[in-house]
Amino acid sequence: MTQQIVWTPRQSAPKAFPERQALMPIWGGIPIPRPQWQNIWRQKLPHAADSDALAYLHIPFCANHCVFCGFYRNAWKESYSSVYTDKIIEEMAAEAEIRQGNGKIRAVYFGGGTPTALQTQDLARLIRACYQYLPIADDCEFTIEGRMSHFDIEKAQACIEAGANRISIGVQTFDTAIRRRLGRKHGGDEAFAYLEKLCEINAVIVVDLMFGLPNQTDAVWQNDLERATALPLSGLDTYAFNLYPMLPINRMVEKGAFPAPPGFDVQADQYAYAVETLAQKGWNQVSNSHFAYPDRGERNRYNTLVKSNIPCWAFGSGAGGNFGGFSYQVQGDLDSYLATPKGEKNIAFMSGHSPNKTLLGQVQHDMETGCLNLSLFDGNAAAQKLIAQWQAMQLFEEQGSDGLIRLNTSGRYWSPTLIRKLMLTLPTQEKDQTMQKLSSEQQIMLRQSLEKNPGQVLEMLAAQNQCSFEDVIRCLPENCIRQTEGSRIVEILQAVAAWDEAVTFIAHTPDAIVEVTGKLPGGKVGRGFYNFDHPETDGGVHGHIYYENCAAIYLLERPFMGKDTCALNFINRNGGAMFKIFVGSDEAGELKQHQIEAMRKLFEAA
């Protein structure tokens, strides 16, 4: 830091792990075949209120796409406001007629997207509808997530008058130059002045800050904290910036338009500085990322409870929820959601909860509040070994008389990685083969989605739709696809090898993505395999392929991660990807056009 603070390992341990990564949200779930979804929904919905729950309403619109954000879905249009609000209210009303039980909603969260993009009258009536159709607890925390654009003080006051009691504003940083590069229209001084006025209304006001942003020096981070704590805020959230591959900012970094974000050495120190500074200023740490100032009403209830797998009712396009031992996602395609017949739940994904999912909720909740119950891993030698290693690394404090170990500042910073590693020590659950053919409706929706954005991760779409990789390929725009018989695998592999030029060979499995760039070696068939010649030099592709498993070969030409790509995709009899071969690039980083033409000719020959 600017003040040259020397942190102890308990405060900052930047070299503890090579990466800081959480589990996928769907981890621990057992996929349920699509034909069963509606029956399960009808059986479970009457019992949704058998216990207390949370409610999440998703507003999937943004006025612009901030380059650091991975939650952008739909561009905002004023015409959406009343139509979308009507549809969510209709969705809530239909479920209210069926639900039974005495459970209460302990927290409501309007997330997005940008919920505050809705027009004032629509946002207010959606809040009132929650009180009409949901069993809201007397002490319910009711949060509206928003940003300064489209959310003036009058609209904020209308939200409070309608029944909200907590407002969360994503500031990220008060540094004007960084804000502008991130896609934020207002400068830092404007943000500060806005928050001063917002804090005058009778509500809990929370601000989100990010650390580890590109160009965010230690001095900038210190100033961000100073400015935030100078405001009469109730809560303050500090999140580490993650450079996920699909974010627009990643393309900017690759092209040199934005500097690379700082590494863990800086992030860990900035987190330690935030924890230390906020404690000195009288703030209480209520979770790994959340801080509350005493006697200003901040409870952080939703953010803490949602990680414990407490039931959460989901409403709106793209919203995710769970109850009755299963998780689900509401249809994320906006047009499809808006066209949902009255009284129906348009479900896009459903999975059952395995015992591992239940345990994950306990571990996540405990670690969010800064502790770990060792008894949860009794008999798990692998987990116990990890915990002992982490204690030696000084990520934990000594075990207390209550059987809990406390995470210190370093442990809390690395908690996503700790949770991930602990859960991956558990035995995997046997899963039914739930892969199925796409329905005509699914095909239409996938085609529309891929027409808008053909650069999506096809493997992820296959998992979400419980279909094969090949089924997703067939939904790509026609100008992206060429197909030939799988029986030509040997011919095509030998043709590529004859180029004597570098290509990229990729094998993508559920457990790894392996890439090798170099000349593809020749090969020949023998003993049921296509056997690559093994060159004397080290490295390169070598091994054996069950060539008879190849049922189809596709040439895909499409954008991916901001770049043009051209690749051969070899498909097995189950519709899965055996491997892929991507066209090489020249010294300027451009695809080699003569390789593209050579691949096309291979398919013209068919």
Name each model feature, range by range:
Residues 76-98, 104-376:
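C-terminal scaffold of the Radical SAM
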